[in-house]
Design a protein with these regions (language model features):
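C-terminal capping region of solenoid repeat domains
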Residues: 195, 200, 216-232, 243-251, ...
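Conserved hydrophobic position(s) of the canonical leucine-rich repeat
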Residues: 5, 17, 27, 40, ...
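Canonical leucine-rich repeat
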Residues: 8-11, 30, 53-56, 80, ...
Length: 299
């Protein structure tokens, strides 16, 4: 870490290697794949200049039997590498390819992409202009998916109904994209265990109601919806917010909400409405909770 290494030498002979941290170097080349006999537990190659990952004769970069963290954030990769498999019996804790130059997936066009089996997949800060439906088509098993800051304009219809593992999804970060709507299959029927969804800094004119179908939805953020010129887009209050039984935190600041006639649910104990210049609402039913410190109002 924090050196001037430009080439990672062949380490395939180090069969018992478990942790490797080469972050903050100047690595452009990985000389040779570790191979599937090297089962890394933690690999950090963040903040380098890596453009591609080598493979062994079996198409493997390394072994994945005990992976906790596998990170290539802040590099120069152009494609999400086809080195994992959604059918693997081993579940990786986290896979991080954030802040590269990724605009697609290896094997997506010819149908050879094998998917991913990981609790968390982070690919924010890349160049994915279209939603990565390939993860769902290949039945990738993921609980938390980070797609922030990609400029994604659309999520194709049928994305979440196409996978038999959509029900595993719990957390979605879709902030800083260009979405204006969510497909009908983005709902609690396909993702019944959704915990948190953040669609802040997009282009919605109304609060998407699909995620509210999930009985477990606890955190929902729809902050700062703007058009390409920076104009505020969201003015309408979601009428069915009271139908979300588990919602405890609702963040809708930075919009242009007007008069709200709906009764604010006392179950929402963190309510953020700051930077809505024209907002008007009645909070009398939660005043006692605010005084008691049991309700956090951010305005």
């Amino acid at each position: 870490t924090f050196n001037n290494l430009t080439v990672l030498p062949d380490m395939s002979m180090v069969k018992k290697l478990g942790k490797l941290d080469c972050a903050y170097n100047k690595i452009k080349t990985i000389e040779k794949a570790f191979g599937r006999d090297v089962n890394l537990v933690q690999l950090s190659m963040d903040h380098n200049l890596i453009e591609e990952l080598p493979r062994d004769e079996n198409g493997s970069f390394c072994g994945y039997a005990d992976v906790e963290s596998f990170s290539f954030a802040y590099n120069k990769l152009k494609k999400f590498p086809n080195i994992f498999s959604s059918q693997s019996v081993y579940v990786m804790s986290s896979v991080n390819f954030s802040f590269n130059e990724i605009d697609g997936f290896e094997g997506e066009e010819d149908g050879t992409f094998k998917g991913v089996n990981a609790n968390t997949i982070a690919i924010g800060g890349n160049k994915l202009k279209k939603f990565p439906t390939i993860l769902f088509k290949t039945n990738s098993q993921v609980s938390a998916l980070g797609l922030n800051g990609n400029g994604i304009e659309e999520i194709p219809k049928g994305t979440f109904s196409a996978s038999k593992y959509s029900y595993m999804m719990k957390t979605l970060d879709l902030t800083y994209n260009k979405l204006s709507k969510l497909p009908d299959d983005f709902n609690g029927r396909n993702m019944p265990f959704l915990y948190g969804v953040d669609v802040s800094n997009n282009r919605f004119t109304e609060v998407p109601t699909g995620p509210m179908d999930a009985a477990t939805l606890t955190v929902y953020a729809v902050r700062s919806q703007r058009d390409e010129n920076g104009n505020r887009l969201l003015r309408k209050w979601p009428s069915n917010i009271s139908l979300c039984p588990s919602l405890r935190q609702f963040c809708i600041g930075g919009n242009d909400l007007r008069k709200i006639t709906d009764t604010i649910s006392s179950y929402i104990i963190v309510f953020e409405i700051k930077d809505n210049p024209n907002i008007s609402l009645n909070l009398s039913n939660v005043c006692n909770m605010i005084k008691a410190g049991a309700y956090l109002l951010i305005y």
